[in-house]
Structure formats: C-alpha cells, structure tokens
Amino acid sequence: MRVLLGTLWLTLACSSVHATLSKSDAKKAASKTLQEKTQVSGKPAQERGLVVTDLRAEDVVLEHRSYCSAKAHRKHFAGDVLGYITPWNRHGYDVAKIFGGKFTHVAPVWLQLRRHGREMFEVTGLDDVDQGWLRAVRKQAKGLRIVPRLRFEDWTYEDFDSVLDNEDEIEELSRTVVQVAKSQHFDGLVVEVWNQLLVQKHAGLIHLLTHMAEALHQARLLVFLVIPPAVAPGTNKLGMFTNTEFEQLAPVLDGFSLMTYDYSTAQPAGPNAPLPWVRACVQVLDPKSKWRSKILLGLNFYGMDYSASKDAREPIIGARYIQTLKDHRPQVVWDSQAAEHFFEYKKSRGGRHVVFYPTLKSLQERLELAQELGVGLSIWELGQGLDYFYDLL
C-alpha cells in the first residue's frame, strides 16, 4: 500500500495546470452567437463522434442538449448507478424521469436526522418529499430504488458521545429512521455521517451503523453510506475511511458512495478528480477486490472555476458552464495525466480564470475505469450535468 501511495504522489505532484494558453487564444471572442440544438438525437453521443480529447467549445454548446431519446431508458453501464438529486437544482427531478432506466438507485437530498434530547430523534426535510414525483419516476423506470440521503444534522460531540455508547439510544434512533422510510414509501436510505466524527469515535460509529443496517434490513430497506476518499486529496496519506473500516462495514451495508472528487484546492487550479487518484482510492479501499461491487465510484457532474486574482474557487454547473463557453469561446485543453478537460478565460474586471468541468471524454475514461475495477457509480448530482452525458450510462 505504501508503494501505491508513493507512486500516486509522484504522478500527481505536477498535475496542477501547467499548460498556458496564448494571449491571442485567451482574448479570442466569439465572432457570432454559438448555436444550440434543441431537438433530441436518433444516435447517442458516442456514435456522433463527440467523445474526443480535441474538444471545441462550439461543439459542446451545439450538442449538449441533444441526447438520444431512443435509448434514454436503456442502461449500458453494467454496475449499479446511484444518482443524487438536490431540491436547489430541480432539473435533476426531470433527469430521473427522462433517464430513469439508466439508474439503479436515485437519492434525493431531502432528509436530516436531528437529536432533541435523550432518546428523542426527529427526521426533518419531509416537506421536500414529492410523492407525485416518486410515483412518476417509478412508473417510468421499473425497479428503480428511491433511497433519499439522510444527513446527521446539528449533532454535537456530546450528542454522538451519548448515543454511540447507549443501546437504548441506538435502538430508538433506528426505530425512528425505519418508521419514516416505511411511511414515506422509500426503498432505503443513503446515510451521511462519517465526516462529522473524529477517528477516536469510529468504532462507536461502526456499531451504530451496524445496528441501523440490521433494523433497516429487517424492514426490507436498503442502506448506503457516504464515505470520504481512501487517499486524502493532494497527499499520499490515507483518508478518514480506510480498508480497516471498509472490511468491518462491507458485509453489513448495501453500498458505499465514495466521494472521489474535489481533489484540488483553491490554488493552483487543478483537476476535480485525477484518474490515477481515483484508481488509488478504490485499490486502497479494497485491495483484494472482495467487495468491489458495493463501491459506488463518485462522479462529479459539476466543475470548478478558479480565480487567479481572488485566490479562490467556486462550483460551476451546466447552465453557467455553457454560458461561459458562449461568452468567451475558449480553447479547451486536454490534461492527459488527470484525464480531464479545462480552459482559461479572462473577465474584463475579474482577471484570469481556469475552469475544470466534466466532458464526455473525461466521463468515458472514468466509466471504463469503473468497469475495469468492478465498481458501480454515484453521481453528484443529476441537476448539474449536461443532458448528453446520460448517453454514456
């Protein structure tokens, strides 16, 4: 494992943006408004010659809405595919209906688990639950499982300390969660809690999750766990969730949503999920390939816009990405080491920016890696991507 991490560090040490575009490229403005197709296509993107490294901004703008309607419900990827949906990017709800057959699980980001005192738990966020949408999605895609994300919200260290060592607390917590999932007609839950606790409490958290899983399984419900990357971004060190924890929970849980994105920090600008790092995260987590089918490799359908003048970054999603391509018509560059595209542009007052955003080619590379490693996919999130991305799934 040390050899693997050391090799990864050497590979990625120089993976921040080192390619520089010429001033003429950076200043190039669109001579005319870039066109967008509004009709769907009879062929998927991969049959239209769009999965390429030599990408042009005008081609992305032209084709991004044009997905293959004939194969919109046909799944190509062999493993499980979980897609997150957030209420603040409502296009994700439409994506789940249009492309529902391409997913095995959909996880709306709806629910929070709160503790109000001894053996007093409440699941909030139920106002966001749309039963009409649930029925519509299930009608469109038979067999699709709805597993909303449940995040432990506003828990103090004292809350965790009280619950993790108390069987009555754990039993009441589990009962509350199961009751809500059953009453709302969910198929299970995606639990997000691991990042909130220090390493010293991980044994207690494993005990809690094991008990929760038993209760959910008794009610014929699924349970997934959101986990951080097994290799800390930008380092050759192990992350907060390693093979040790994975081996204890893999027999108990139905799957793990692995957060293999957000690799680069504010400066220097760099890739969202360099391919060698993504590979290492899976191999370190499960080196013997014993439970690979339960790992859902994280795919970001958002990008990052890095500002050199502000020494900062901010997320960029599909609509703004397309508008940036229209406004600046940049030269798009392929980073072969990270297997990601990026481009530079300059604001009149905001200085130089660098944008990394997923493309058909970068996604195809990760789908092929997932197939090779024998893992599934978890997409954050469906409302942030471009419609023709789903041709690949």
UniProtKB/Swiss-Prot annotation:
Pfam families for this protein: Glyco_hydro_18 (PF00704)
Residues annotated as domain GH18: 79-393
Signal peptide segment: 1-19
PROSITE patterns the record matches: GH18_2
Primary location: secreted
Entry keyword set: Immunity, Innate immunity, Lysosome, Secreted, Signal
GO biological process, one term: innate immune response
Entry-linked InterPro entries: Chitinase_II/V-like_cat, Chitinase_insertion_sf, Glyco_hydro18_cat, Glycoside_hydrolase_SF
Job description of the protein: Saccharide- and LPS-binding protein with possible roles in pathogen sensing and endotoxin neutralization. Ligand-binding specificity relates to the length of the oligosaccharides, with preference for chitotetraose (in vitro).
Subunit relationships: Interacts with STAB1.
Family indicated by similarity: Belongs to the glycosyl hydrolase 18 family.
Protein's name according to its UniProt entry: Chitinase domain-containing protein 1
Organism, as annotated: Bos taurus (Bovine)
